[in-house]
């Protein structure tokens, strides 16, 4: 848990068939006086249980502040994933990590944070 930034992860499609593509949504809300850098790059990884793989590029909006390009936290980060074709019907959990760098506007410090996530998806026949 990061006391400076609140991250909520949801899945756009709660029910998917084996081999289907879904989308993870990352709501990133920095506290007052904190911003999220996009350099070094944001990173999303899935735990290695082979139930799903990331597909396509991460999609996010940015804003300019002076010479910096920052994450626009008013819009979610979107990352597509594809379920394995051999998935059996039932409930699964997509687990992984979201890595980002957050910084203090006033004090100038920055820190890396690895946010674990765990979202539920129902695999349908």
List each model region and its residues.
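Extracellular/lumen-exposed scaffold segments
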Residues: 1-125
């Amino acid at each position: 848990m990061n006391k400076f930034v609140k991250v909520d992860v949801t899945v756009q499609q709660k029910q998917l068939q084996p081999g289907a593509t879904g989308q993870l949504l990352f709501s990133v809300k920095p506290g007052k006086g904190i911003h999220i850098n996009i350099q070094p790059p944001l990173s999303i990884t899935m735990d290695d249980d082979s139930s799903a793989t990331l597909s396509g590029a991460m999609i996010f909006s940015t804003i300019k502040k002076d010479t910096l390009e920052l994450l626009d936290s008013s819009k979610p980060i979107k990352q597509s994933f594809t379920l394995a074709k051999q998935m059996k019907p039932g409930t699964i959990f997509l687990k992984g990590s979201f890595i980002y760098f957050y910084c203090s506007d006033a004090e100038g410090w920055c820190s890396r944070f690895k946010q674990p996530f765990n979202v539920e998806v129902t695999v349908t026949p």
